[in-house]
Amino acid sequence: VGTVLKDEPLYKHTTYRVGGPAKLFIKVQNVDELIEVIKYCRKHRIQLFVIGRGSNLLFSDKSFEGIIISLEDMNQYHVNGSEVTAQCGVTMIKLAYDCAKIGLSGFEFMGGIPGNIGGGIFMNAGAYKSCLSEVVKKWLNYLKMKWIFHIDILSFKTILNGLSWKLLLFWKIKVLKKLMKL
């Protein structure tokens, strides 16, 4: 079930560097591990909290007695033509730069946004008058295990674990120049 850390200080996993220890901190690497941990927590009525890279999160300095599930290691993506499919732990900065390198346009605004794609989708992250809802085609919701299209509304209990985009193909030099202007 991924990497399990006991009494892990949460300040190590947030951009604000605050937070006390979590009784258990589990880094999952794929959907099967994520499902296994969530089912375990539900079966045993254990409080759980899902995080990505910890940007825009504030944890109490008191101990968290439940399980923190980190999606940070779910960081694989692949490109098929102009369509990008990514796990939720891919960082927005990495995806923006990697897409620019191969001439895909549409993610340039993410070039300076901390955090990962899953959290970015959840809060509709954006910059430079663009946001993720403008480029996301669909996402995979753990609770329903089906693809949901971007016109649907996310509930607070939604756990994103996969995303897909349709981008525009441009000459690499144009995309890189646009990215460098940001």
Locate the predicted segments by residue.
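Short, well-ordered alpha-helical segments in soluble proteins
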Residues: 99, 117, 121-125, 171
